[in-house]
Amino acid sequence: MTTKAEGEKLLYCSFCGKSQHEVRKLIAGPSVFICDECVDLCNDIIREEVQEADGLKPKSGKLPTPKEICAILDQYVIGQTQAKKNLAVAVYNHYKRLEQGGQKDDVEIAKSNILVIGPTGSGKTLLAQTLARLLDVPFVMADATTLTEAGYVGEDVENIMQKLLQKCDYDVEKAQRGIVYIDEIDKISRKSDNPSITRDVSGEGVQQALLKLIEGTVASVPPQGGRKHPNQEFVQLDTTNILFICGGAFDGLEKIIRRRSEKGGIGFGAEVKSKEDARAIGEVLRDVEPEDLIKFGLIPEFVGRLPAIATLESLDEDALVTILVEPKNALTKQYIKLFKMEGVDLEFREAALRMIAKKALERKTGARGLRSIMEHALLEIMYDLPSIPNLRKVVVDEGVIKGDSPPILIYADEPRLETAS
């Protein structure tokens, strides 16, 4: 017969410390116990990690189709229909490939990284950022002009992976399914398409260093942004499933394409083309071939790692005006909201929008230059705005953008129009 002391010996959960009377079930193992509450907690943690590893799909849980991706891109980026289609298909196929990655099959689908070619301010970066936001995946940008080969002064290519890890709070699983956008990729072209015996640490050397990273390798990244040194444990990051999007303006590439197409026209059946090809640069860039990129200065192996090519066209005046008013985060909407915070309405007349677009075209800055033009034009009224009593509305016309006249001010207690002094 057991004594009372032995019969009342309490057992405790080895994880949370609760007694057997405080929980519904206590599961025994070799010298350890776990309660039903801790089992539920462990299940929740594992389920969350599995969902995150799977979590390339947007928050709805379903990967959007190329048409749905294009429709969302249309809300933020004006025009560039063909480029959007190219990007939507490439991104959809990439993440579809990752969805099926766990299935055993004899056919392995290779990764298709993307090259985006287009003039400054045409929307290359915005497209990549919008895609990452839509798919709810980590996104990081890198500038190719700051990269050098490992061992030289400057950033080495593994710094890109370090930025990606930092973006995910060093969650390796999450980082391994992110998007990396490398801008100014055309600036690391070698000086000629002939191999050189001299060292080119910021051109061909960087292309060579990026090769393995883009194709898929296990990169050793210093923990928590530290510098590499011996006897240090590195974070191992597999880049196989990271989508790389490389973008650049590729100034002069259209001349290489035109020269190639002129050489191709030989014989009676050939299409006759004038020396001065009247086609727009964007239209010419659509005909780009890998050989043109190699002539430009990208090494053949690097071109081969970027099979999906999307070309963007220069934005004309109409497109720039549309960019000012239509997208969800259009500049005019941003300034209207800013003025509304002061209790004042802001109106842009059509002529003012046209003048902003013309100035951006003159500066050859594309959509990127629109904000600086508006900021300069509205500086004086934004300076005075909090100090003007009873102001109801500000009207911006062409003269304000030109700098010839102040904006029209409409006061709450006066129906007539006045101008800022």
Curated annotation (Swiss-Prot):
Key word Amino-acid biosynthesis present: no
Q: SMART domains annotated for this entry?
A: AAA, ClpB_D2-small, zf-C4_ClpX
The UniProt entry's GO biological process terms, in alphabetical order, are: cell division; proteolysis involved in protein catabolic process
Name the UniProt record assigns to this protein: ATP-dependent Clp protease ATP-binding subunit ClpX
Record InterPro entries: AAA+_ATPase, ATP-dep_Clp_protease_ClpX, ATPase_AAA_core, Clp_ATPase_C, Clp_protease_ATP-bd_su_ClpX, ClpX_bact, P-loop_NTPase, Znf_CppX_C4
Q: What organism does the UniProt record list as the source? A: Methylobacillus flagellatus (strain ATCC 51484 / DSM 6875 / VKM B-1610 / KT)
Complex formation: Component of the ClpX-ClpP complex. Forms a hexameric ring that, in the presence of ATP, binds to fourteen ClpP subunits assembled into a disk-like structure with a central cavity, resembling the structure of eukaryotic proteasomes.
Q: Where does ATP bind?
A: 119-126
Top-level division of the source organism's lineage: Bacteria
Positions with a binding annotation for Zn(2+): 13, 16, 35, 38
